[in-house]
UniProtKB/Swiss-Prot annotation:
It is found in: Cytoplasm. Homodimer. It comes from Pseudomonas fluorescens (strain ATCC BAA-477 / NRRL B-23932 / Pf-5). PANTHER family: SERINE HYDROXYMETHYLTRANSFERASE (PTHR11680:SF50). This is Serine hydroxymethyltransferase 1. Pathway: One-carbon metabolism; tetrahydrofolate interconversion; Amino-acid biosynthesis; glycine biosynthesis; glycine from L-serine: step 1/1.
Length: 417
Protein backbone atom coordinates (compact mmCIF):
# COMPACT_ATOMS: atom_id res chain seq x y z
CA UNK A 1 0.00 0.00 0.00
CA UNK A 2 1.23 3.49 -0.88
CA UNK A 3 1.03 6.42 1.49
CA UNK A 4 -0.34 9.61 -0.04
CA UNK A 5 2.11 11.48 2.17
CA UNK A 6 5.12 9.98 0.36
CA UNK A 7 6.17 12.94 -1.77
CA UNK A 8 9.07 13.18 -4.20
CA UNK A 9 10.80 15.52 -1.76
CA UNK A 10 10.74 12.81 0.91
CA UNK A 11 11.50 9.84 -1.35
CA UNK A 12 14.05 11.11 -3.88
CA UNK A 13 15.99 14.17 -2.78
CA UNK A 14 18.24 14.18 -5.86
CA UNK A 15 15.33 14.18 -8.30
CA UNK A 16 13.41 16.72 -6.23
CA UNK A 17 16.41 19.06 -6.24
CA UNK A 18 16.60 18.95 -10.04
CA UNK A 19 12.85 19.59 -10.33
CA UNK A 20 13.08 22.55 -7.98
CA UNK A 21 15.99 23.96 -9.95
CA UNK A 22 13.97 23.68 -13.14
CA UNK A 23 11.02 25.41 -11.48
CA UNK A 24 13.35 28.22 -10.42
CA UNK A 25 14.80 28.47 -13.93
CA UNK A 26 11.33 28.81 -15.42
CA UNK A 27 10.46 31.59 -12.98
CA UNK A 28 13.74 33.53 -13.33
CA UNK A 29 14.40 33.15 -17.06
CA UNK A 30 12.47 34.69 -19.95
CA UNK A 31 11.23 31.97 -22.29
CA UNK A 32 11.22 32.91 -25.99
CA UNK A 33 11.34 29.47 -27.61
CA UNK A 34 8.35 29.53 -29.95
CA UNK A 35 7.31 25.95 -29.21
CA UNK A 36 7.30 26.33 -25.43
CA UNK A 37 4.67 27.57 -23.00
CA UNK A 38 3.54 27.13 -19.40
CA UNK A 39 0.58 24.90 -18.55
CA UNK A 40 -1.98 25.63 -15.89
CA UNK A 41 -1.77 23.84 -12.52
CA UNK A 42 -4.94 21.94 -13.50
CA UNK A 43 -3.21 20.50 -16.57
CA UNK A 44 -0.27 19.38 -14.43
CA UNK A 45 -2.61 17.93 -11.81
CA UNK A 46 -4.31 15.76 -14.44
CA UNK A 47 -0.96 14.43 -15.63
CA UNK A 48 -0.07 13.37 -12.11
CA UNK A 49 -3.41 11.69 -11.45
CA UNK A 50 -4.48 8.06 -10.91
CA UNK A 51 -5.36 7.89 -14.61
CA UNK A 52 -1.71 7.04 -15.26
CA UNK A 53 -2.44 3.59 -13.78
CA UNK A 54 -4.99 2.52 -16.41
CA UNK A 55 -4.29 0.65 -19.62
CA UNK A 56 -6.96 1.35 -22.24
CA UNK A 57 -6.01 -0.04 -25.64
CA UNK A 58 -8.72 0.74 -28.16
CA UNK A 59 -11.24 3.58 -28.18
CA UNK A 60 -14.15 4.61 -25.91
CA UNK A 61 -16.72 1.82 -25.89
CA UNK A 62 -14.36 -0.52 -27.79
CA UNK A 63 -11.52 -1.38 -25.41
CA UNK A 64 -9.39 -4.50 -25.19
CA UNK A 65 -9.25 -4.30 -21.38
CA UNK A 66 -11.92 -4.18 -18.71
CA UNK A 67 -12.35 -1.44 -16.16
CA UNK A 68 -12.34 1.36 -18.73
CA UNK A 69 -15.75 2.86 -17.98
CA UNK A 70 -14.31 5.98 -16.35
CA UNK A 71 -11.37 6.55 -18.66
CA UNK A 72 -13.94 6.29 -21.47
CA UNK A 73 -15.67 9.32 -19.95
CA UNK A 74 -12.36 11.17 -19.75
CA UNK A 75 -11.38 10.42 -23.33
CA UNK A 76 -14.84 11.23 -24.71
CA UNK A 77 -14.75 14.60 -22.94
CA UNK A 78 -11.45 15.36 -24.66
CA UNK A 79 -12.80 14.24 -28.05
CA UNK A 80 -15.98 16.29 -27.78
CA UNK A 81 -14.17 19.41 -26.60
CA UNK A 82 -11.57 19.15 -29.38
CA UNK A 83 -14.30 18.85 -32.00
CA UNK A 84 -16.14 21.85 -30.56
CA UNK A 85 -12.98 23.92 -30.29
CA UNK A 86 -11.91 23.46 -33.90
CA UNK A 87 -15.24 22.84 -35.63
CA UNK A 88 -14.24 19.29 -36.59
CA UNK A 89 -16.40 16.22 -37.12
CA UNK A 90 -13.66 13.82 -36.04
CA UNK A 91 -10.99 13.98 -33.35
CA UNK A 92 -8.41 11.45 -32.18
CA UNK A 93 -6.84 12.54 -28.89
CA UNK A 94 -4.54 9.53 -28.45
CA UNK A 95 -1.33 10.51 -30.31
CA UNK A 96 1.50 10.83 -27.80
CA UNK A 97 3.10 13.70 -29.76
CA UNK A 98 2.73 15.79 -32.88
CA UNK A 99 5.32 13.78 -34.76
CA UNK A 100 3.45 10.57 -33.96
CA UNK A 101 0.20 12.16 -35.11
CA UNK A 102 1.89 13.03 -38.40
CA UNK A 103 3.32 9.53 -38.75
CA UNK A 104 -0.16 8.10 -38.21
CA UNK A 105 -1.57 10.32 -40.98
CA UNK A 106 1.06 9.08 -43.42
CA UNK A 107 0.44 5.48 -42.36
CA UNK A 108 -3.30 5.92 -42.82
CA UNK A 109 -3.35 7.56 -46.23
CA UNK A 110 -0.09 6.65 -48.00
CA UNK A 111 1.88 3.66 -49.17
CA UNK A 112 5.65 3.45 -48.94
CA UNK A 113 7.24 5.32 -51.84
CA UNK A 114 4.27 7.62 -52.44
CA UNK A 115 5.15 11.22 -53.24
CA UNK A 116 4.53 13.96 -50.69
CA UNK A 117 5.02 17.70 -51.20
CA UNK A 118 5.96 19.59 -48.04
CA UNK A 119 7.78 22.70 -46.89
CA UNK A 120 11.57 22.49 -46.75
CA UNK A 121 13.02 22.36 -43.25
CA UNK A 122 15.62 24.92 -44.33
CA UNK A 123 12.83 27.33 -45.30
CA UNK A 124 10.70 26.94 -42.17
CA UNK A 125 9.09 23.51 -42.49
CA UNK A 126 9.29 20.64 -40.01
CA UNK A 127 11.33 17.44 -39.88
CA UNK A 128 8.17 15.37 -40.35
CA UNK A 129 7.20 17.14 -43.58
CA UNK A 130 9.68 15.19 -45.69
CA UNK A 131 13.12 16.09 -44.33
CA UNK A 132 15.75 13.58 -45.46
CA UNK A 133 16.74 12.69 -41.89
CA UNK A 134 13.12 11.95 -40.88
CA UNK A 135 11.14 8.77 -41.53
CA UNK A 136 8.85 10.96 -43.65
CA UNK A 137 11.78 11.57 -45.97
CA UNK A 138 12.99 7.98 -45.89
CA UNK A 139 9.71 6.11 -46.40
CA UNK A 140 8.18 8.48 -48.95
CA UNK A 141 9.35 10.34 -52.04
CA UNK A 142 9.54 13.81 -50.52
CA UNK A 143 9.48 16.89 -52.74
CA UNK A 144 10.05 20.23 -51.01
CA UNK A 145 8.75 23.75 -51.58
CA UNK A 146 10.16 26.86 -49.92
CA UNK A 147 9.93 30.62 -49.66
CA UNK A 148 10.82 33.27 -52.21
CA UNK A 149 13.22 36.23 -51.99
CA UNK A 150 10.65 38.12 -49.92
CA UNK A 151 10.42 35.32 -47.38
CA UNK A 152 6.94 34.26 -48.50
CA UNK A 153 5.56 30.99 -49.83
CA UNK A 154 5.25 31.19 -53.62
CA UNK A 155 1.96 29.37 -54.22
CA UNK A 156 2.47 29.38 -57.98
CA UNK A 157 5.71 27.48 -57.39
CA UNK A 158 3.89 25.05 -55.08
CA UNK A 159 1.35 24.49 -57.86
CA UNK A 160 4.11 24.00 -60.44
CA UNK A 161 5.79 21.38 -58.26
CA UNK A 162 2.47 19.66 -57.63
CA UNK A 163 1.67 19.47 -61.34
CA UNK A 164 5.17 18.21 -62.11
CA UNK A 165 5.44 15.57 -59.38
CA UNK A 166 1.75 14.69 -58.81
CA UNK A 167 2.04 14.04 -55.06
CA UNK A 168 -0.38 11.75 -53.26
CA UNK A 169 -0.36 14.28 -50.40
CA UNK A 170 0.43 17.98 -49.98
CA UNK A 171 1.60 19.01 -46.51
CA UNK A 172 0.90 22.55 -45.31
CA UNK A 173 2.46 23.61 -42.03
CA UNK A 174 5.66 24.97 -40.52
CA UNK A 175 7.94 25.32 -37.55
CA UNK A 176 9.42 28.71 -38.47
CA UNK A 177 7.17 30.69 -40.85
CA UNK A 178 5.77 33.97 -39.58
CA UNK A 179 3.00 34.59 -42.09
CA UNK A 180 -0.55 33.34 -42.73
CA UNK A 181 -0.94 30.13 -44.72
CA UNK A 182 -3.44 30.35 -47.59
CA UNK A 183 -5.48 27.21 -46.94
CA UNK A 184 -7.99 27.80 -49.79
CA UNK A 185 -5.07 28.07 -52.24
CA UNK A 186 -3.52 24.86 -50.90
CA UNK A 187 -6.92 23.16 -51.30
CA UNK A 188 -7.17 24.38 -54.88
CA UNK A 189 -3.71 23.01 -55.70
CA UNK A 190 -4.46 19.67 -54.02
CA UNK A 191 -7.71 19.31 -55.94
CA UNK A 192 -5.97 20.13 -59.21
CA UNK A 193 -3.64 17.14 -58.86
CA UNK A 194 -5.95 14.84 -56.90
CA UNK A 195 -3.87 14.95 -53.71
CA UNK A 196 -4.82 14.76 -50.07
CA UNK A 197 -4.33 18.06 -48.23
CA UNK A 198 -2.76 17.49 -44.83
CA UNK A 199 -2.30 20.51 -42.55
CA UNK A 200 0.03 20.42 -39.55
CA UNK A 201 -1.07 23.40 -37.44
CA UNK A 202 1.02 22.50 -34.39
CA UNK A 203 2.49 25.97 -34.02
CA UNK A 204 -0.70 27.97 -34.49
CA UNK A 205 -3.40 25.73 -32.98
CA UNK A 206 -3.99 28.11 -30.09
CA UNK A 207 -4.35 31.03 -32.48
CA UNK A 208 -6.76 28.97 -34.60
CA UNK A 209 -8.81 27.97 -31.55
CA UNK A 210 -9.15 31.64 -30.61
CA UNK A 211 -10.12 32.72 -34.12
CA UNK A 212 -7.06 34.92 -34.68
CA UNK A 213 -5.58 32.66 -37.39
CA UNK A 214 -7.51 30.92 -40.21
CA UNK A 215 -8.93 27.49 -39.38
CA UNK A 216 -7.62 24.80 -41.76
CA UNK A 217 -10.23 22.18 -40.79
CA UNK A 218 -12.82 23.23 -43.45
CA UNK A 219 -10.18 22.96 -46.19
CA UNK A 220 -7.98 19.99 -45.25
CA UNK A 221 -8.62 16.27 -45.51
CA UNK A 222 -6.84 15.89 -42.19
CA UNK A 223 -5.30 18.25 -39.63
CA UNK A 224 -2.81 17.50 -36.87
CA UNK A 225 -1.48 19.55 -34.00
CA UNK A 226 0.43 19.32 -30.80
CA UNK A 227 -1.48 20.24 -27.66
CA UNK A 228 1.28 22.37 -26.13
CA UNK A 229 2.89 25.38 -27.86
CA UNK A 230 0.24 28.08 -28.40
CA UNK A 231 -2.54 25.74 -27.24
CA UNK A 232 -0.91 25.78 -23.79
CA UNK A 233 -1.74 22.21 -22.82
CA UNK A 234 0.24 19.04 -22.09
CA UNK A 235 2.82 17.63 -24.45
CA UNK A 236 0.82 15.49 -26.84
CA UNK A 237 -0.78 15.20 -30.27
CA UNK A 238 -4.23 15.53 -31.82
CA UNK A 239 -5.74 14.56 -35.18
CA UNK A 240 -8.81 16.32 -36.61
CA UNK A 241 -10.88 15.86 -39.75
CA UNK A 242 -14.16 16.63 -41.42
CA UNK A 243 -16.77 13.88 -41.72
CA UNK A 244 -15.43 11.08 -43.90
CA UNK A 245 -16.08 7.55 -42.66
CA UNK A 246 -13.30 6.00 -44.73
CA UNK A 247 -10.62 8.47 -43.59
CA UNK A 248 -11.79 8.29 -39.96
CA UNK A 249 -11.50 4.50 -39.94
CA UNK A 250 -8.03 4.63 -41.49
CA UNK A 251 -6.84 7.27 -39.02
CA UNK A 252 -8.11 5.35 -35.99
CA UNK A 253 -6.41 2.16 -37.18
CA UNK A 254 -3.19 4.03 -37.95
CA UNK A 255 -2.98 5.45 -34.42
CA UNK A 256 -3.96 2.17 -32.74
CA UNK A 257 -2.72 -0.42 -33.40
CA UNK A 258 -0.70 1.02 -36.28
CA UNK A 259 1.60 3.48 -34.53
CA UNK A 260 0.89 3.13 -30.81
CA UNK A 261 -0.29 0.76 -28.13
CA UNK A 262 -2.07 1.99 -25.04
CA UNK A 263 -3.10 5.65 -24.85
CA UNK A 264 -1.86 7.88 -22.03
CA UNK A 265 -5.17 8.59 -20.31
CA UNK A 266 -3.60 10.95 -17.76
CA UNK A 267 -2.30 13.09 -20.63
CA UNK A 268 -5.65 12.82 -22.44
CA UNK A 269 -7.30 14.16 -19.26
CA UNK A 270 -4.86 17.07 -19.36
CA UNK A 271 -5.80 17.63 -23.01
CA UNK A 272 -9.47 17.76 -21.99
CA UNK A 273 -8.64 20.51 -19.49
CA UNK A 274 -6.56 22.35 -22.08
CA UNK A 275 -9.47 22.29 -24.56
CA UNK A 276 -11.86 23.57 -21.88
CA UNK A 277 -9.46 26.41 -21.10
CA UNK A 278 -9.21 27.25 -24.80
CA UNK A 279 -13.01 27.49 -25.07
CA UNK A 280 -13.10 30.36 -22.54
CA UNK A 281 -13.37 34.03 -23.67
CA UNK A 282 -10.11 34.98 -21.95
CA UNK A 283 -8.22 32.56 -24.19
CA UNK A 284 -9.05 34.68 -27.23
CA UNK A 285 -7.68 37.77 -25.49
CA UNK A 286 -4.53 35.83 -24.61
CA UNK A 287 -3.93 34.75 -28.22
CA UNK A 288 -4.55 38.24 -29.55
CA UNK A 289 -1.90 39.49 -27.13
CA UNK A 290 0.52 36.76 -28.25
CA UNK A 291 0.40 38.13 -31.81
CA UNK A 292 0.64 41.76 -30.68
CA UNK A 293 3.70 40.91 -28.58
CA UNK A 294 5.45 39.11 -31.45
CA UNK A 295 4.79 42.04 -33.76
CA UNK A 296 6.07 44.51 -31.16
CA UNK A 297 9.33 42.60 -30.80
CA UNK A 298 9.83 42.24 -34.55
CA UNK A 299 9.36 45.99 -35.02
CA UNK A 300 12.16 46.73 -32.55
CA UNK A 301 14.59 44.38 -34.30
CA UNK A 302 13.81 45.94 -37.68
CA UNK A 303 14.25 49.45 -36.27
CA UNK A 304 17.64 48.43 -34.84
CA UNK A 305 18.84 47.25 -38.26
CA UNK A 306 18.32 43.50 -37.97
CA UNK A 307 16.77 41.36 -40.71
CA UNK A 308 13.48 39.74 -39.77
CA UNK A 309 12.71 36.96 -42.26
CA UNK A 310 9.50 37.70 -44.21
CA UNK A 311 9.69 41.31 -43.02
CA UNK A 312 7.63 40.82 -39.88
CA UNK A 313 5.09 38.45 -38.35
CA UNK A 314 1.37 37.75 -38.41
CA UNK A 315 1.45 34.98 -35.82
CA UNK A 316 3.34 34.11 -32.64
CA UNK A 317 6.86 33.74 -34.00
CA UNK A 318 9.52 35.19 -36.27
CA UNK A 319 13.02 34.41 -37.46
CA UNK A 320 15.92 36.80 -37.03
CA UNK A 321 18.68 36.47 -39.62
CA UNK A 322 22.14 37.32 -38.33
CA UNK A 323 23.93 36.77 -41.64
CA UNK A 324 24.46 40.51 -42.11
CA UNK A 325 26.00 40.81 -38.64
CA UNK A 326 28.16 37.69 -39.22
CA UNK A 327 26.96 36.24 -35.92
CA UNK A 328 26.17 32.55 -35.54
CA UNK A 329 22.91 31.49 -33.99
CA UNK A 330 24.86 29.23 -31.67
CA UNK A 331 26.92 32.10 -30.25
CA UNK A 332 23.90 34.40 -29.99
CA UNK A 333 21.91 31.70 -28.20
CA UNK A 334 24.73 31.19 -25.69
CA UNK A 335 25.15 34.91 -24.99
CA UNK A 336 21.43 35.42 -24.42
CA UNK A 337 21.36 32.36 -22.19
CA UNK A 338 23.90 34.04 -19.89
CA UNK A 339 21.40 36.88 -19.53
CA UNK A 340 18.62 34.41 -18.59
CA UNK A 341 16.90 34.81 -21.96
CA UNK A 342 16.12 31.45 -23.55
CA UNK A 343 15.85 31.26 -27.34
CA UNK A 344 16.82 28.70 -29.96
CA UNK A 345 19.31 28.96 -32.78
CA UNK A 346 17.61 28.37 -36.13
CA UNK A 347 18.64 28.05 -39.74
CA UNK A 348 17.52 30.87 -42.01
CA UNK A 349 17.03 30.89 -45.80
CA UNK A 350 20.35 30.62 -47.66
CA UNK A 351 22.13 29.95 -44.39
CA UNK A 352 25.90 29.50 -44.93
CA UNK A 353 26.30 27.73 -41.59
CA UNK A 354 25.37 24.18 -40.60
CA UNK A 355 22.09 23.36 -38.77
CA UNK A 356 24.16 22.81 -35.62
CA UNK A 357 25.55 26.35 -35.77
CA UNK A 358 23.08 28.38 -37.93
CA UNK A 359 22.91 32.09 -38.68
CA UNK A 360 19.61 32.85 -37.04
CA UNK A 361 17.42 32.87 -33.98
CA UNK A 362 13.77 31.92 -33.65
CA UNK A 363 11.62 33.93 -31.27
CA UNK A 364 8.11 33.20 -30.01
CA UNK A 365 5.86 35.00 -27.53
CA UNK A 366 3.39 32.39 -26.15
CA UNK A 367 5.29 31.86 -22.88
CA UNK A 368 6.04 35.51 -22.08
CA UNK A 369 2.42 36.38 -22.82
CA UNK A 370 1.25 33.70 -20.38
CA UNK A 371 3.26 35.36 -17.62
CA UNK A 372 1.70 38.76 -18.41
CA UNK A 373 4.01 40.53 -20.84
CA UNK A 374 2.35 43.07 -23.11
CA UNK A 375 3.73 45.21 -25.93
CA UNK A 376 5.69 47.55 -23.63
CA UNK A 377 7.55 44.72 -21.90
CA UNK A 378 8.19 42.95 -25.21
CA UNK A 379 9.63 46.07 -26.82
CA UNK A 380 11.88 46.58 -23.82
CA UNK A 381 12.94 42.93 -23.97
CA UNK A 382 13.73 43.15 -27.69
CA UNK A 383 15.89 46.18 -26.96
CA UNK A 384 17.87 44.25 -24.36
CA UNK A 385 18.42 41.45 -26.87
CA UNK A 386 19.63 43.96 -29.46
CA UNK A 387 22.08 45.38 -26.93
CA UNK A 388 23.59 41.93 -26.39
CA UNK A 389 23.67 41.07 -30.10
CA UNK A 390 25.49 44.34 -30.78
CA UNK A 391 28.44 43.11 -28.69
CA UNK A 392 28.22 39.41 -27.83
CA UNK A 393 31.35 39.37 -25.71
CA UNK A 394 30.49 42.37 -23.54
CA UNK A 395 29.98 40.73 -20.15
CA UNK A 396 28.98 44.03 -18.56
CA UNK A 397 26.02 44.37 -20.93
CA UNK A 398 25.04 40.74 -20.36
CA UNK A 399 25.22 41.19 -16.58
CA UNK A 400 23.11 44.35 -16.73
CA UNK A 401 20.46 42.68 -18.88
CA UNK A 402 20.37 39.65 -16.58
CA UNK A 403 19.52 41.88 -13.63
CA UNK A 404 16.72 43.51 -15.63
CA UNK A 405 15.42 40.07 -16.61
CA UNK A 406 15.38 38.90 -13.01
CA UNK A 407 13.51 42.03 -11.96
CA UNK A 408 10.79 41.76 -14.59
CA UNK A 409 10.39 38.03 -13.95
CA UNK A 410 9.90 38.73 -10.25
CA UNK A 411 7.30 41.36 -11.14
CA UNK A 412 5.49 39.00 -13.54
CA UNK A 413 5.80 35.43 -12.19
CA UNK A 414 4.62 32.37 -14.10
CA UNK A 415 2.78 30.90 -11.13
CA UNK A 416 1.42 33.43 -8.66
CA UNK A 417 0.13 32.91 -5.16
Amino acid sequence: MFSRDLTIAKYDADLFAAMEQEAQRQEEHIELIASENYTSPAVMEAQGSVLTNKYAEGYPGKRYYGGCEYVDVVEQLAIDRAKELFGADYANVQPHAGSQANAAVYLALLQGGDTILGMSLAHGGHLTHGAAVSSSGKLYNAIQYGIDANGLIDYDEVERLAVEHKPKMIVAGFSAYSQILDFPRFREIADKVGAYLFVDMAHVAGLVAAGVYPNPVPFADVVTTTTHKTLRGPRGGLILARANADIEKKLNSAVFPGAQGGPLEHVIAAKAICFKEALQPEFKAYQEQVVKNAQAMAEVFIARGFDVVSGGTKNHLFLLSLIKQDISGKDADAALGKAFITVNKNSVPNDPRSPFVTSGLRFGTPAVTTRGFKEAECKELAGWICDILADLNNEAVIDAVREKVKAICKKLPVYGA
